[in-house]
């Protein structure tokens, strides 16, 4: 009896877990975001060859965040991380107007994968502190987010170095994870 009550309470109040895949073009700020969330500070990063994985605790949810390198040569490896992914964080360098079309193509390619059909999509429009940065509405348009019909998505203006917008993004993920949970 006591065990079943504790199981019930744990189900109601226990820690939920969410597997997150964080991707985007190279130099978008994925690793900086990961360690700003994990450590609360800016770390010096080098281009990610392979992946970084960290657990980030937020509002009784344990987010396991897989930060996968974004160079064009290693993007085909992203698919190896798709299984059991509940949420995708797609990071865009808001200042990189030359590559926004490339970002859109990579995002659309990934979202067409069957293994990710139920995954939530959070887009971080990163580097909002730069003077020429595209705002969230412009990035929404350029990525074609309004055409996504069967997917929950959200775009959040962010600045990885200051932390602006990062927790608002996690807030959206946590609220929508709870909505999808049984």
Curated annotation (Swiss-Prot):
An example Gene Ontology biological process: vesicle-mediated transport
Primary localization class, coarse: Golgi
Similarity annotation: Belongs to the small GTPase superfamily. Arf family.
Keywords: ER-Golgi transport, Golgi apparatus, GTP-binding, Lipoprotein, Myristate, Nucleotide-binding, Protein transport, Transport
Name of the protein described by the UniProt record: ADP-ribosylation factor
An example Gene Ontology CC term for this record: plasma membrane
Molecular function terms from GO: GTP binding; GTPase activity
UniProt subcellular location: Golgi apparatus
Keyword Translocase included in the entry's annotation: no
Lipidation feature positions (N-myristoyl glycine): 2
Amino-acid positions noted as binding GTP in the UniProt annotation, renumbered to this chain: 24-31, 67-71, 126-129
Pfam families recorded: Arf (PF00025)
Function (record text): GTP-binding protein involved in protein trafficking; may modulate vesicle budding and uncoating within the Golgi apparatus.
Gene name as annotated: ARF
